[in-house]
Amino acid sequence: MKIVVLAGGLSTERDVSFKTGDMVAKALRENGHQVILLDVFMGYSDKKEDLTGIFDRSEEVSVKVSGIPEIAPDLAKVKASRKDQSDNFFGPNVIELCQMSDIVFMALHGENGKIQAAFDLFGIRYTGTGYLSSALAMDKEMSKKLFLSAGIPAPKGASMKKADCSDDITKLGIQFPCVVKPCCGGSSIGVSIAHNAEEYKAALDEAFRWEENLIVEEYVKGREFSVGVIEGKALPIIEIAPVQGFYDYKNKYKAGSAVETCPAELSEAVTEKMQHYAEQVAQVLGLDTYSR
């Protein structure tokens, strides 16, 4: 098959996405497919004639990927480095290349459904969840409302907009310690744990650096787990134990910063309960094929 692995984009998780896309592209090539790893924002060339026979030189034209930096990318610099200086989310020839493929593998992180909606309009086949479920899953406020309405437990919390922000946590009915996070971010970028009023104010400032809307939740001390779901069925549970601090951007992607154990050491009853909730989440949000 001719496959475009779509990665990068104008997202704070841009670098993480490249690493994901690179691993996917290599695995697909090993299985005999012609694969192009493509940056959705930068695109490829600005000449239509350069697309002729492009899948026959797929590795040559693919994005070259190195390691993941310890800090999130500066998106202003990314935008400034684009050759055509366009504000179009799709780089040159991205739509054309995707239309030439048999399917697009979505390796983007922080995707909110907009690309899926565009691909639906263009008739481009892609992997994973459609536009509506992607948008819901990316929005923590909306997804939490759906979880609670379905009886899926979630931490006590409140949403806040920058325009009506207050640094008085008592107005939210939440006590310290608390977690402050952007509403639609990923990879723990902009996430802080605040233990007092001074840390809370700093946490608000940090979260608002990335987004106009944020979530403030009670801090639940405990272990961290990840549960994948494929075709509605939960996979074995992974426990993630950061060596230091919480599972932030640095600990997620720096080698040796966290210890992962699979299957997690849990009782059978707890394992079944967690897997049940993971399957419920996928069902409530309408997530197709795979989720985590």
Model-inferred region functions:
Residues 108, 182-183, 218, 282-286:
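Short Gly/Pro-enriched turn/cap motifs at secondary-structure boundaries
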Residues 1, 6-10, 268-292:
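ATP-dependent carboxylate activation and anion-phosphoryl transfer catalytic cores
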Residues 195-276, 281:
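Phosphate-binding site of ATP-dependent enzymes
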Residues 1-7, 11, 15, 19, ...:
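Active-site nucleotide/adenylate-binding loops and adjacent lid/helix of ATP-dependent enzymes
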Residues 39, 214, 218, 286-292:
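A short glycine-rich, hydrophobically flanked beta-strand micro-motif that places a catalytic Asp/Glu
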Residues 1-132, 136-138, 142, 161-169:
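ATP-binding N-terminal substructure of ATP-dependent carboxylate-amine bond-forming enzymes
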Residues 125-130, 154, 236-237:
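Short hydrophobic/aromatic-enriched beta-strand-loop microsegments
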